[in-house]
C-alpha cells in the first residue's frame, strides 16, 4: 500500500505516476480520496485548536483557587473540550481508516527506471542467454510429446477435477520432483537461502498483506468454514510469496539480520478467472501447479541490489539446465499490482515458437511491508522503518518441465534429460513412463 501521508501531500504527483501504468490506475485514486484527505485535514486543524484551548484551560485552572466559581467554570469548560476532542479524534480515526480502505486497491508507483509503455508490447528485452535449439525436424509441443510418451494424462485429470488440471505419470512425475529438489538444493546450498515449508492455507489477512486481497479475490480459491466459531476465512495459496512474506507480518526485525532470504516449494492454486479461453492446452495455465519461490527482505538502501541478485539467482536455474531464455524489463503498463519493478524470465518453447514467462522477479519497495507491517530497526534504539520486499519464482516447475520437453526433444520422440537432473532421475533420456 502507498504511504497515505505521502499520497495526501503529493496527490497530483502520485496520480501522474499512476497514469504511467494506465488511466484505470490513475482513476483508482479518485475524488473520494481527495475529499477524505480534505476532511481529515479540516478535522485535524479543529482538533489541534481544541487541544490548544484545553492546554490553556489547564494552565488557567492551575492559577485559580479550587474553591472559586471561576475554577468550577473552567472545569466545566475543560470537560466540554475533552468531549469534543474525543469525538474529533474518533472522526479523524474513521477518516484515516477510510483513506486506508481507498488506498488498498491502488497499485504501487513504478520505479523511475521502469520503461514507460501501455502493455506487453512496451516491455524491453534487456539480455538473453544461450541459443535457440535447432532441429532437423519440426519440433512438437509439450502436450504432444508428453501424451505420446504416456507422461501427461489430460483426460483422466479432467475426469478427476475438470479443466486445467494434469496427471503426471511415471518419468514426468519424477522429473517434477527432481526439479524441485534441484532448485531447492541450488538456492539453499549455493545461494544462501533458508528453506521454508509453509502452510498451503492462509488467512485473509495474509493475502491482504501481499496485495492479493481485496482486489484479486476472484482469482483465489476460498474454503468453506467447517467451524462456525472460526473468526477468519482460509484460502488456498496462489503462490508461496503469500505465506513466506507474511512470516514477518507485524514484526520489527533487527537491522543486522537483513537481508533475509527464504526459498520455499509449494503447490499453488489459482482460479484463472480472467483467462477464459487462453492456454487451454497443456501445462501452461493450470488451476494447480508447483513452484519454488524466492523471497528477500532488505533495507531500503539495498533494495535495488537485492532485486538484481534475486533475479540472477532465478536465472542460474535456467543456465544450469541449459535452457535458452531472455530477460524482459516490464513496462509501466504491464507491472503487477504491487510491483514497482519487475523482470520476467521468458523461456523459449520451440514447439510453440514463442517465449513464455517462467519467472517474474519483482521489487515491491515498502508496498507489501506497509500492508503487512513488516519493519526493522536500523540501530538498537532507532525508530522502526519499513523493510523492502522482493520475490520471484525460481522457478515455476511445470513450465520448466514444458521447456525441457520442448528444448530437449529428439527426432524419435524421446527427450534428453539435462545433465544436472540425471542423478535425481536415474536416466539420461525419457523414453516413456
From Swiss-Prot:
Where does this one sit in the cell? Cytoplasm
Q: Where does L-serine bind?
A: 239-241, 293, 393
In terms of CDD domains, this protein maps to:
SerRS_core (cd00770)
Q: Which Gene3D superfamilies match?
A: Bira Bifunctional Protein, Domain 2, Serine-tRNA synthetase, tRNA binding domain
GO process terms (BP): selenocysteine biosynthetic process; seryl-tRNA aminoacylation
Q: What is its main location?
A: cytoplasm
PROSITE patterns for this protein: AA_TRNA_LIGASE_II (PS50862)
- GO MF terms on file? ATP binding; serine-tRNA ligase activity
Q: Which reaction does it catalyse?
A: tRNA(Ser) + L-serine + ATP = L-seryl-tRNA(Ser) + AMP + diphosphate + H(+); tRNA(Sec) + L-serine + ATP = L-seryl-tRNA(Sec) + AMP + diphosphate + H(+)
Tell me which GO cellular component terms the UniProt record holds.
Answer: cytoplasm
Matching entries from Pfam families are given as:
Seryl_tRNA_N, tRNA-synt_2b
Q: Which residues bind ATP?
A: 270-272, 357-360
Q: What is its EC number?
A: 6.1.1.11
Q: How does it assemble?
A: Homodimer. The tRNA molecule binds across the dimer.
Q: What does this protein do?
A: Catalyzes the attachment of serine to tRNA(Ser). Is also able to aminoacylate tRNA(Sec) with serine, to form the misacylated tRNA L-seryl-tRNA(Sec), which will be further converted into selenocysteinyl-tRNA(Sec).
UniProt comment concerning the protein's domains: Consists of two distinct domains, a catalytic core and a N-terminal extension that is involved in tRNA binding.
- Family the UniProt entry places it in: Belongs to the class-II aminoacyl-tRNA synthetase family. Type-1 seryl-tRNA synthetase subfamily.
PANTHER family, per the entry: SERINE--TRNA LIGASE (PTHR43697:SF1), SERYL-TRNA SYNTHETASE (PTHR43697)
Q: Could you identify this protein by its name?
A: Serine--tRNA ligase
What is the primary gene name for this protein? serS
Amino acid at each position: 500500500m502507498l504511504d497515505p501521508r505521502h499520497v495526501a501531500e503529493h496527490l497530483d504527483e502520485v496520480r501522474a505516476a499512476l497514469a504511467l501504468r494506465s488511466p484505470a490506475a490513475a482513476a483508482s485514486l479518485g475524488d473520494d480520496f481527495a475529499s477524505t484527505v480534505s476532511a481529515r485535514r479540516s478535522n485535524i486543524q479543529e482538533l489541534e485548536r481544541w487541544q490548544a484551548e484545553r492546554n490553556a484551560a489547564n494552565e488557567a485552572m492551575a492559577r485559580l483557587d479550587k474553591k472559586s466559581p471561576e475554577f468550577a467554570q473552567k472545569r466545566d469548560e475543560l470537560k466540554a473540550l475533552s468531549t469534543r476532542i474525543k469525538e474529533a479524534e474518533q472522526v479523524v480515526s474513521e477518516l484515516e481508516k477510510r483513506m486506508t480502505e481507498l488506498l488498498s486497491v491502488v497499485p504501487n508507483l513504478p520505479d523511475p527506471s521502469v520503461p514507460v509503455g501501455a502493455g506487453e508490447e512496451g516491455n524491453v528485452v534487456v539480455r538473453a542467454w544461450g541459443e535457440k535449439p535447432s532441429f532437423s525436424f519440426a519440433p512438437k509441443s509439450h502436450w504432444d510429446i508428453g501424451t505420446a510418451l504416456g507422461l501427461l494424462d489430460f483426460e483422466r485429470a479432467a475426469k478427476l477435477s475438470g479443466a486445467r488440471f494434469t496427471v503426471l505419470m511415471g518419468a514426468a512425475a519424477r522429473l517434477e520432483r527432481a526439479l524441485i529438489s534441484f532448485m531447492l538444493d541450488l538456492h539453499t546450498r549455493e545461494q544462501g537461502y533458508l528453506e521454508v515449508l509453509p502452510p498451503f492455507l492462509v488467512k485473509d489477512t495474509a493475502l491482504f498483506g501481499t496485495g492479493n486481497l481485496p482486489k484479486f479475490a476472484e482469482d483465489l480459491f476460498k474454503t468453506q468454514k467447517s467451524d462456525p466459531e472460526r473468526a477468519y476465512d482460509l484460502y488456498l495459496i496462489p503462490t508461496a510469496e503469500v505465506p513466506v512474506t507474511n512470516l514477518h507480518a507485524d514484526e520489527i526485525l533487527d537491522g543486522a539480520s537483513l537481508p533475509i532470504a527464504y526459498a520455499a516449494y509449494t503447490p499453488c492454486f489459482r482460479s484463472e478467472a480472467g483467462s477464459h479461453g487462453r492456454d487451454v492446452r497443456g501445462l501452461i495455465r493450470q488451476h494447480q501447479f508447483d513452484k519454488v519461490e524466492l523471497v528477500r527482505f532488505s533495507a531500503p538502501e539495498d533494495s535495488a541490489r537485492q532485486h538484481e541478485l534475486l533475479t540472477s539467482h532465478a536465472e542460474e536455474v535456467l543456465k544450469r539446465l541449459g535452457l535458452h531464455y531472455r530477460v524482459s524489463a516490464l513496462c509501466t503498463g504491464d507491472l503487477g499490482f504491487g510491483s514497482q519493478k519487475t523482470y520476467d524470465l521468458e523461456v523459449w518453447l520451440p514447439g510453440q515458437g514463442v517465449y513464455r514467462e517462467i519467472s517474474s522477479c519483482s521489487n515491491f519497495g515498502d508496498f507489501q511491508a506497509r500492508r503487512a507491517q513488516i519493519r526493522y530497526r536500523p540501530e538498537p534504539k532507532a525508530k522502526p522503518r519499513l523493510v523492502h520486499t522482493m520475490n520471484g519464482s525460481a522457478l515455476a516447475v511445470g513450465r520448466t518441465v514444458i521447456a525441457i520437453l520442448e528444448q530437449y526433444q529428439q527426432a524419435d520422440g524421446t527427450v534428453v534429460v539435462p545433465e544436472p537432473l540425471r542423478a535425481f532421475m536415474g536416466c539420461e533420456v525419457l523414453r516413456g513412463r
